């Protein structure tokens, strides 16, 4: 079961943050114009109705990342890898990549690909949600793949809905906007099973980047249920790096390390799950420094962040590259639909990472339990999120 509200609330809040050119989400005065006309900067491409190449090797694919670096060993990089794999499978040119200096450049970078009449524009992360929605609204004849942006919340006119009424049908209004979403509670559940099994103290922790992040909430909700499945008496401590600053939440490993170290000292946990992007790399560093196990997020962080591989027992994975490359193939084949493109265990869209150097520390019984749980997820018989899925009030304070 998925809850639409919090995942989309973060897009609405991000829209206000970006429009104000601030990471604090401040100032109703600066946010009001964006609420009235959120897509003022998005324009249609020139040259009439866009036509797609009949030769699949001629398709032009571009990638617009989130703030940070393309080789961030995380969301941007794996999204880009998926686009490159999709292009390679077609025999098309390697996609060019643009990286914003800050959130104010997100829309401009996407518009750049529109102006060059690209066929498929891939955008990374929920922070790109409003800009991608706007570009897709202005250019309904160009394909957009928005990673971690589904399901889209739009007005009856197909514009981003910062009032969060979601009265529009995105699939109809934005027919070529493929907004990828993931069932975060499923990999979170698997990570929770690992945490509860590996814990000796019976106390485990989870740190999310920002309270506004619906996917972060679902990750930790699944983590809680998975841990309780293994040990009903497990103690879970949860904290959040920030309530308003997206840069600090997801792109500040120094803050992450300091925050993680204090969290470990205060709560005496011996397994720590990070759900904070690049900030979480610092949290994993803190786990290693404290001599406890860390659990990564989104990608296999034992590989993507080798600095912490010695203590990263597993990661709760979204198959980012697979979802992007698959959607590119489906678009060119003519089978892809717009709207929410949901990836879960049934589509092999989630999973847990190998144990790598810590393989010998993991009981064989846990490996079998994880395989069984994943099989139940694929069959749709395992509940991995509470009834209020996506509701932060269900988590420990």
Summary of predicted features, one role per range:
Residues 23, 29-397:
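A residue-level marker of the well-folded mature domains of exported/periplasmic proteins
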Residues 17-20:
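C-terminal motif of bacterial Sec signal peptides marking the signal peptidase cleavage site
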Residues 3, 23-24:
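N-terminal targeting and processing segments of secreted/endomembrane and organelle-targeted proteins
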Residues 1-12:
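N-terminal export and membrane-targeting signals
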């Amino acid at each position: 079961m998925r809850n639409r509200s919090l995942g989309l609330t973060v897009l609405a809040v991000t829209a206000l943050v970006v429009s104000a050119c601030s990471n604090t989400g401040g100032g109703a005065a600066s946010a009001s114009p964006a609420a009235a006309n959120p897509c003022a900067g998005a324009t249609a491409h020139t040259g009439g109705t866009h036509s797609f190449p009949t030769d699949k090797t001629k398709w032009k694919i571009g990638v617009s990342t989130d703030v940070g670096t393309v080789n961030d060993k995380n969301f941007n990089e794996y999204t880009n890898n998926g686009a490159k794999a999709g292009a390679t499978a077609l025999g098309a040119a390697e996609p060019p990549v643009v990286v914003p200096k800050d959130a104010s450049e997100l829309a401009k970078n996407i518009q750049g690909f529109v102006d060059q009449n690209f066929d498929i524009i891939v955008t990374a992360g929920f922070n790109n949600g409003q800009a991608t929605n706007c570009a897709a609204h202005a250019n309904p004849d160009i394909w957009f793949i928005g990673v971690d942006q589904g399901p889209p919340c739009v007005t009856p006119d197909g514009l981003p809905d910062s009032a969060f009424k979601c009265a529009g049908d995105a699939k109809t209004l934005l027919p070529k906007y493929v907004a990828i979403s993931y069932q975060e509670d499923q990999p979170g559940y698997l990570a929770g099973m690992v945490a509860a099994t590996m814990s000796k103290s019976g106390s485990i922790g989870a740190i999310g980047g920002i309270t506004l992040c619906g996917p972060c909430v679902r990750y930790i909700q699944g983590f809680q249920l998975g841990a309780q499945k293994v040990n009903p008496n497990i103690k879970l401590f949860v904290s959040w790096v920030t309530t308003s600053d997206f840069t600090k939440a997801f792109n500040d490993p120094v803050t992450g390390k300091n925050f993680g170290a204090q969290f470990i000292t205060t709560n005496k946990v011996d397994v720590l799950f990070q759900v904070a992007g690049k900030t979480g790399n610092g949290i994993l560093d803190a786990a290693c420094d404290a001599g406890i196990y860390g659990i990564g997020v989104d990608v296999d962080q034992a590989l993507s962040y080798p600095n912490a591989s010695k203590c990263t027992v597993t990661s709760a994975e979204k198959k980012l590259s697979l979802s992007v490359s698959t959607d590119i193939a489906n678009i060119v084949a003519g089978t892809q639909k717009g709207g929410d493109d949901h990836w879960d265990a049934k589509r092999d869209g989630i999973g847990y990472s190998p144990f790598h150097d810590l393989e010998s520390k993991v009981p064989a019984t846990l490996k079998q339990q994880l395989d069984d749980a994943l099989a139940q997820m694929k069959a749709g018989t395992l509940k991995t999120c509470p009834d209020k899925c996506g509701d932060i009030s269900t988590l420990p304070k």
